[in-house]
């Protein structure tokens, strides 16, 4: 995230954002004013009220299925589903509470065999006890658990 972007998000009262990819399962408060100097320990800035929601390229359909100049794409949908389910299982084993964000683009996931995989995936997560919610609701749940002081 660009330095000015954080200022603008805070200035315009954004509640959450999800571009930093700082954690796979735990939301956290975005810091402002970190100091990074060569050959020196990092100095952390102050936490802001802005909540960073977890997101990861490994839980995004685009890198797995679409061809780019650096990736072949067209992975087997079932192997992607297996990885995504295992990510959820790992989260439930290793955290007391967490959020896992799966990013699905209509033009990527919306192909026949991938839609069938998505149906199986949602059913499997339901069987494993997943709660499905919008990102703004998940951010509010985090905020209730970890109020900004």
Located regions from the model:
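C-terminal domain-boundary segment and adjacent tail
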Residues: 74-149
């Amino acid at each position: 995230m660009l330095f000015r972007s954080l200022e603008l998000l805070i200035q315009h009262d954004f509640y959450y954002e999800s571009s930093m990819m700082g954690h796979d399962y735990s939301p956290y408060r975005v810091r402002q004013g970190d100091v990074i100097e060569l050959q020196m320990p990092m100095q952390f800035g102050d936490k802001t009220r802005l909540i960073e929601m977890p997101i990861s390229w490994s839980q995004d359909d685009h890198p797995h299925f679409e061809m780019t100049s650096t990736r072949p794409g067209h992975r087997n949908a079932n192997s992607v589903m297996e990885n995504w389910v295992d990510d959820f299982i790992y989260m439930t084993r290793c955290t007391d509470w967490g959020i896992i964000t799966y990013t699905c683009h209509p033009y990527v996931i919306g192909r026949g065999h991938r839609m069938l995989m998505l149906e199986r995936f949602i059913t499997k997560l339901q069987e494993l006890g997943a709660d499905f919610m919008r990102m703004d609701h998940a951010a509010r749940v985090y905020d209730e658990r970890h109020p900004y002081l």
